[in-house]
Amino acid sequence: MSDDPIVLAKAALRLEAAVRRDAAHAAGGETAAGAVARHGIGVLGERSFRTISGYWPMRSELDIRPLLGLLADTGRDVALPVVLGLGQPLEFRRWRPGQALEFGRFGTAHPPPEAKRLEPDVLLVPLLAFDAAHHRLGYGAGFYDRTLAALRRHKPVLAIGVAYAAQRVEAVPRDAWDQALDLVLTEEGIL
């Protein structure tokens, strides 16, 4: 284990944040999913973009499948991320409601290899904790940080964290390579 204070602070916060998220999910996950769909389509429905990436929820992540369905109904391309390997950015494959998914690394679900690869303009990003400055704490493998950095090098993208309001913390410990979010979407609205 590292003795780097940021690494230690992140590890401690991950444990606390997972408990906090589990409790929020148990207390109202289904209700929160509906609220996030309403808030999300309200904000995203009027924006100009072609492709949005979401995620298939695992563990106690906030369920954005209702929002993904609404976005697909608007005619936009919806993609889900694929973990190709450690140290690599995510790949995004087109998803359509009702499509069969495969299970990949770390328990993620994604479209099969023959699905069209897409580059998102907007990313809906899962997380364990966030703060008022839109800093995000993930699971620690750096997939979204690498992906956002790679995308932002050649085009503007909108990164929206998705979380229960209870996942907000005073401050997320950060390293220089951590990518901030542009917005955070919770069951209470957009921050």
Question: What name fits each language-model region?
Answer:
Residues 2, 88-191:
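Conserved phosphate- and dinucleotide-binding cores of soluble alpha/beta proteins
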Residues 2-119:
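N-terminal active-site beta-alpha-beta segment that forms phosphate/nucleotide-binding
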